[in-house]
Amino acid sequence: MTTAPLERVRLRFTLLDTDANGYVEADDFERLAIRIIKAVAEPVSSPKALAVLEGHRRYWRGLVDDLGADHDGRVALHEYVTHVARPERFDDVIREYAESLALLLDVDDDGFIEHAHFLACMRAVGFHPASVDALFAELDPYGAGKVAVRAWVASIKDFYGSQRTDIPAQRLLAVPSVG
C-alpha cells in the first residue's frame, strides 16, 4: 500500500476509534452512528437512523469476521491495515454503509445532500471543516450548494477502497481531523 492510501487508512482507523483506546470495537461503531444521527437531528428510531445503525453494525461485523482469528472483539491498527488491503472483500459492506449515510443526509429525499447536513455529518465523524468544505466543493462542481447522493456514495466507496490519490475524498487528508 502506498503512502497516500495508507494515510487514509490511518485516518479512518483514528476516526472509527471513537474512545481513542487504540482499538476499534463494536461500541465505537455504535457511538459513531449515534453521533452522526444526532448531528443531523434525525430521530434515532426513524427508518433512516436505523439504516445508519445497521450499516455501522454490518461494517463492524464484516471487519471482525474477516479479522476475528484471535476473537478478542477488537481490531488494532495493524489488523485494520491488513483488512483494508483487500477492499474487494468488503465492497458490499461499504456500499451499504455509504448508502445509509447518504440517504440519512438526503433529508427531503430529492437525491441531493445540502451543505449544512454534509458538514454536520462529517464534523460528527471527526473531519476538519476545511477538509469537508474542500470535498464538498469537489463533489459540487457547479456550486449548487448540494451534492448528488450517488456522487457521495461513490466518494465514500473510493475513500475506503481505492488505492488512487486523485479521488475527491483525498481532500479529507488536507487538514488534520478534529477528533
Outline where the language-model segments fall.
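A short, hydrophobic/aromatic-rich structural module that often spans a beta strand
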Residues: 79-101, 135
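Short helix-capping and inter-helix turn/linker motifs at the boundaries of alpha-helical repeat units
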Residues: 1-4, 54-55, 92-93, 125-127
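Short, intrinsically disordered linker segments that flank or connect zinc-binding domains
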Residues: 1, 48-49
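Primarily EF-hand calcium-binding motifs
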Residues: 5-21, 50-72, 96-110, 131-150, ...
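Conserved aromatic-histidine-acidic binding/catalytic patches
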Residues: 1, 21, 120, 124, ...
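The feature marks the first
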Residues: 2-41
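Amphipathic regulatory helices of Ca2+-sensor modules
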Residues: 25-46, 74-89, 112-126, 148-162
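Acidic/histidine-enriched, glycine/proline-rich intrinsically disordered or flexible terminal extensions
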Residues: 158-179
